[in-house]
Swiss-Prot record:
Pfam families: DEAD (PF00270), Helicase_C (PF00271), Sir1 (PF11603). Residues 1318-1461 have a biased composition (Low complexity). Residues 1095-1244 form the Helicase C-terminal domain. Catalyzes DNA unwinding and is involved in telomerase-independent telomere maintenance. Its EC number is 5.6.2.-. This is Y' element ATP-dependent helicase protein 1 copy 6. The keyword Repeat applies. It comes from Saccharomyces cerevisiae (strain ATCC 204508 / S288c). Residues 1462-1485 have a biased composition (Basic and acidic residues). GO terms for biological process: telomere maintenance via recombination. Gene3D superfamilies: P-loop containing nucleotide triphosphate hydrolases.
Amino acid sequence: MEIENEQICTCIAQILHLLNSLIITFLDDDKTETGQSFVYIDGFLVKKHNNQHTIVNFETYKNKMKVSDRRKFEKANFDEFESALNNKNDLVHCPSITLFESIPTEVRSFYEDEKSGLIKVVKFRTGAMDRKRSFEKIVVSVMVGKNVQKFLTFVEDEPDFQGGPIPSKYLIPKKINLMVYTLFQVHTLKFNRKDYDTLSLFYLNRGYYNELSFRVLERCYEIASARPNDSSTMRTFTDFVSGTPIVRGLQKSTIRKYGYNLAPYMFLLLHVDELSIFSAYQASLPGEKKVDTERLKRDLCPRKPTEIKYFSQICNDMMNKKDRLGDILHIILRACALNFGAGPRGGAGDEEDRSITNEEPIIPSVDEHGLKVCKLRSPNTPRRLRKTLDAVKALLVSSCACTARDLDIFDDNNGVAMWKWIKILYHEVAQETALKDSYRITLVPSSDGVSVCGKLFNREYVRGFYFACKAQFDNLWEELNDCFYMPTVVDIASLILRNREVLFREPKRGIDEYLENDSFLQMIPVKYREIVLPKLRRDTNKMTAALKNKVTVAIDELTVPLMWMIHFAVGYPYRYPELQLLAFAGPQRNVYVDDTTRRIQLYTDYNKNGSSEPRLKTLDGLTSDYVFYFVTVLRQMQICALGNSYDAFNHDPWMDVVGFEDPDQVTNRDISRIVLYSYMFLNTAKGCLVEYATFRQYMRELPKNAPQKLNFREMRQGLIALGRHCVGSRFETDLYESATSELMANHSVQTGRNIYGVDSFSLTSVSGTTATLLQERASERWIQWLGLESDYHCSFSSTRNAEDVVAGEAASSDHHQKISRVTRKRPREPKSTNDILVAGQKLFGSSFEFRDLHQLRLCHEIYMADTPSVAVQAPPGYGKTELFHLPLIALASKGDVKYVSFLFVPYTVLLANCMIRLSRCGCLNVAPVRNFIEEGCDGVTDLYVGIYDDLASTNFTDRIAAWENIVECTFRTNNVKLGYLIVDEFHNFETEVYRQSQFGGITNLDFDAFEKAIFLSGTAPEAVADAALQRIGLTGLAKKSMDINELKRSEDLSRGLSSYPTRMFNLIKEKSEVPLGHVHKIWKKVESQPEEALKLLLALFEIEPESKAIVVASTTNEVEELACSWRKYFRVVWIHGKLGAAEKVSRTKEFVTDGSMRVLIGTKLVTEGIDIKQLMMVIMLDNRLNIIELIQGVGRLRDGGLCYLLSRKNSWAARNRKGELPPIKEGCITEQVREFYGLESKKGKKGQHVGCCGSRTDLSADTVELIERMDRLAEKQATASMSIVALPSSFQESNSSDRCRKYCSSDEDSDTCIHGSANASTNATTNSSTNATTTASTNVRTSATTTASINVRTSATTTESTNSSTNATTTASTNVRTSATTTASINVRTSATTTESTNSNTSATTTESTDSNTSATTTESTDSNTSATTTASTNSSTNATTTASTNSSTNATTTESTNASAKEDANKDGNAEDNRFHPVTDINKESYKRKGSQMVLLERKKLKAQFPNTSENMNVLQFLGFRSDEIKHLFLYGIDVYFCPEGVFTQYGLCKGCQKMFELCVCWAGQKVSYRRMAWEALAVERMLRNDEEYKEYLEDIEPYHGDPVGYLKFFSVKRGEIYSQIQRNYAWYLAITRRRETISVLDSTRGKQGSQVFRMSGRQIKELYYKVWSNLRESKTEVLQYFLNWDEKKCREEWEAKDDTVFVEALEKVGVFQRLRSMTSAGLQGPQYVKLQFSRHHRQLRSRYELSLGMHLRDQLALGVTPSKVPHWTAFLSMLIGLFCNKTFRQKLEYLLEQISEVWLLPHWLDLANVEVLAADNTRVPLYMLMVAVHKELDSDDVPDGRFDILLCRDSSREVGE
């Protein structure tokens, strides 16, 4: 009877719980007549009105209710509401999860009032200090009275296990953690005031110690892993069950996380002598060993921690308790229970800690003695404590193993006592972790599932997720099937897996002896293995590089859905590392085929501790088929596509490298091959296993129909609960089966004892057969419950398309026909070696002779031999053109056959030069390739000449493919044949990274149609040549030998292709002569590159008036500026990549043919292929040139000459972009050329310098004479003091700003004139940058003018003056470092002035002077760099104003003297109206007091000095040195905390200005711009310079600084100069468009006119299309952002009906737009609220501009004669631009078509760019965003070939601006 009553009570309770969960349904259904409805939820009355749920007061609303509602709620208990009403705190705890699931929540900030101790909400008038101490909570707001608001926060109640039955089973036995007090005794670890000052060092430099700990652990682990093989250190497979390794395999990411967790404890060890908690150690007796902390700090430098021997000895001594060192380790282990702050985030394990929020680190408080002690507000959680102990154990084992002879101290039985104590601690913490599970599991019998933290998880959830992943797998398979005849999954399963003739009987791990290097692939007979690889389809007749890449990418993508299919199919879940390491071969193999059931079985061990025996899990038949198919078909395709040269994987400790005698000699290629043939789940692009970040992306989207998604840990707990309660195991009868299920999930090692009453049950307690049977039964139960087998037979249609079958059968014959076509010999006239000689005499005359035998041999090889493909590398100037020119003339002389050949060059500027050279003497008929593409073959032309873009164009490819048919129809003969395909400078295919996407179309070209392919270059060593040929789809260079297996695989890959290798002729190596020895090469460091270049050019033209020169500049802007400024001296031609093709050809031709043209200025595109006879000088101003660009540039000097490499002094070293060659280095140029070509080095030997470093022995007599004449002219100019005209002001401005940038915090340019002065011209003589002598002169570094004289930075000697930059002394003067002072003059930049003399930065003493850099003051002088003032003059490094003189660092002019070392203009003699004076507050007058130690005050002072302008409205661009007009267009508006990704500078409970604890705050009074804000902006600057992948890697690199914005700013400021240069370089085009308003014309974009109809439209047509698109969107109520993101035409009526921004954003959020945006695009690299906030306040100026233009749009519509339609309002317009910005496909297409723009990576820059105007084809102006919409529409249009998927790839975003 009692049992029945108990069951009845249980049922009633369950029913009540279900009714409570259905309350939300009543909220929608139970409505009153007034549109309102009320419902009671856990003590609160909830009102629903207009889809809004709010908590209301019953007493207030009861008179407004219907009578029935009022009666219903009158008896309700509103105790919870009354409790909230009476609570004095603003924040009130609420235990109702249903309430929080029903009512919208918000995030609010709260603080603890110091006076009352109450928790109050942060309001507008809350003080600054209270705001800094605030913390954030997720709350529900409640209006408890008039203007009285409370906030509810969810706090879960303790479940009452004593109060009778409860409707659900909670997994929270207890919540209070006393372990840190009882076991670790943390309350006895007290810190005094001195300790706190020491600990502040850690928090001030946490990033440093994070990096230090990681590097130390990494180094120790490397040494420990390299110990000789023994059972204690090296893991072997036979050691799998019987023992565990001491030094375990760790991935690098794990080592990094361990290192970050160890940072606080490494700090404690390094300061063991200073902290009072180590008092026991500090009281050691004389003679006992002490820790030399200074030596440790030196040895453990984080940049290179190689010296770890001493550290290892200390660790060994601590483990052995030598002297009192054991006390140190004892204290450190106890300190592990202290929470020193959040550890690193990321990875699978970190998801387990996501429920732990608002953790507070150790906070100091004052005890009764006035000492600061550690008050533990929140100790480490058990899970985090366990991770910390994991890290400590790893460090102790690795460090001790570095020097210990053996590792017996870690033995479980005979080890030292310290190790045993550590294991006890770890065991207790692990047990506590198991009990502290924070996930609430509730049974939901009605839906056959459970509720995990209020989220429903049942059978339908699992099946929906599983089949969504299966569908994704099938979709990717279909993409491969479009290119190949792919066998289906069912085909392979039926043919092999289900075929009983194929046996899979083999021993499995943990059962029988393991056989190394086995795989179930070896069990498959050879006859089956030969037919599994798919064949190419007929329309895809080439296995090009692009197709190979498509194969590898597709297989990488379908790996992730397969992982999820396995995860759900096994049922008893894996932790992610176990799933990640599944392997089908090798020593870590765990994937097998069961010979009986023909299902895949997985034998895995518990990866987390490696101590348990293997677990057997069996997959269902459907999943088994997919896994088998992946291994046998897809992985083998991937291996073939990657090729034998694939080497992306590095050796990682988690790999077991077997089969090599010396594992240290294993190359990356060997490792990659092992990984590909062993592990299942790989990311071949990155060279790593599939990362957890990639894996978990599916959880955010799938299953589609689930209202709430579970994270990975919740899903794991849910799967365990399903297996426990829903799969059908009964505790009474299936005792061992239930226990087996728990162990298969690795859920608890004590499950048998605690739950099932079995004493320490494990699978080893039963026989091996029984263990296998129990596990197979468990898997069978899960498979039956999930129902995957029922879908097995209908999951994949076994029938194939009849056409595919026929085509597949015919593929073999097609293949042989293709090969026969390629290998057949062409009918042609007999050739003779005499043909080449005759051709040479036609071209050069009867006296023609070859240069050497190499040239003769190569001409005969090209003309006579049957080699189908030839590559030639010859030095520049060798005569490579003749190598194909003579054979072409010989071919043209054949009468019976007409040969048509093609020549392609890299740049348009070479076209004119090539056509002139090749058409001379009338030997060949030459025409542009464009004629052939547009009109076809004319029957007359022998050679068509074009550029690489023509070679890659689809029209050219189609013309060649249809050649035979067209020729036969046009000329009625087959005697018109394709001759040579010649590609000049073919190294560009590999080295021009930013253009590689343009070359993709070349892979579609049928090379086999040509008689011969010839590739020429002067800079293509074997490695570059081989890679370049493979990039365009060819086989590559011929190898000396080929293995038979490799040959067979090559044939498989190249079905239907020509696999001829290219023969390489390397004339440079054959001749063994270093190229360019005939040119004199000089590297000069100068103050101003343009100024020095102008001097050199003027000198050259004075000596050789008829000569020519080439100047290579770095940017297009510089090209134009040089051309404008030099035009007054000589005739100039300038070229860069932004010119149209016709203009480039015209200008090049003009420079070559017009003898009056002197200088050709351009970017690096002018350095290749141009042949100019009168050229005598090449000057390079681009310090980013690589060795190839240098050789090409110098190679223009055919007969000798001078080459100058000019770089600016103190310039930052250029950094090579990803995939590019590094820039040339300072030093011997010839040695770098030798290294590039692979020639023997002569460094330090005779003959090292050839034409460089002052050597003239190898130069021609003419070149030597030219050098001597240039030298004599320079000496003559110096002697005669010839004045050279200054450069334009633009150069002076830029150079002066560059010089001042390192001294000034701002680059504000100001030209101020003061009474009695003139700029750059005075009554006296002025000498600039020359050695001049005058009577009375003053040297200054800026443009300062006085009545008496002007001094420049050179060595000028006068009677009454001072020499600068030298140690010269005059009658009444003093030498200073940069400025000289005389009786009537004062020098700038050092600011020390006296009546008779000045000493600055020297130790010179005069009669009436004081030395600078001190605080000394004399009667008539004051020293600089201090704030001292005297009667006569004032010199200081701050802004000082006196009667006699004033200091200034800008262009100031005075009557007598001016001194400058500060940034403001000078005020002299009351002439304030001519100057702008900016007063600066004296910091000494406004001193303030802040709490904190001296260490904090010192750090605060250092930071203030490093970032001095944070008291103003400073931004990071000012800090970098940009001018105000540049900042106006580059300014990073919209950058706030939400720009930062989650976890980066977003910690709570710390100072909001510096992210440090309040007691360690380094912010200072009056600081307007916080360090945290500057860190946000610095991060945005880094984003400006990186694409998505590079930025993601950068975020990983700065992980140590994620919680330390101050440390990050220090790290950022180190490379400020480099960043400044990069922005100037990469955004020069952007500033030209937005700042100077340069016009963008679509007609200047060659690719745009060729590849898009939009670029041929008029402005009217573009506008009509724009309005039509918006009209359609408005009519269909399409969601705008989603449409422009990926052309998805989803409906969202609420968006179009929204009246304000808030409602608009809510509508987007409701349909999940922002969620999809973050998961699908680069928006995921920002914070979760970043895109949403763009609709609020960030774009006010742009919004007002747009709204003002709405009237203009209406006028345009009326002018166009269309019906006026509503132009999109601002929010819709902004949605469009955001969608376009995140649409990667569209952006790549636009950037490819519109050549004047490049990629931008910040949304504000994109919005500004979208609003500039462009010239349409009819020269009418339209906004760029209209053109964007037109291109977007074209990509989605049906009349575009292949629709949206045939997208032309774009250039690399980091490309050079010039071309």
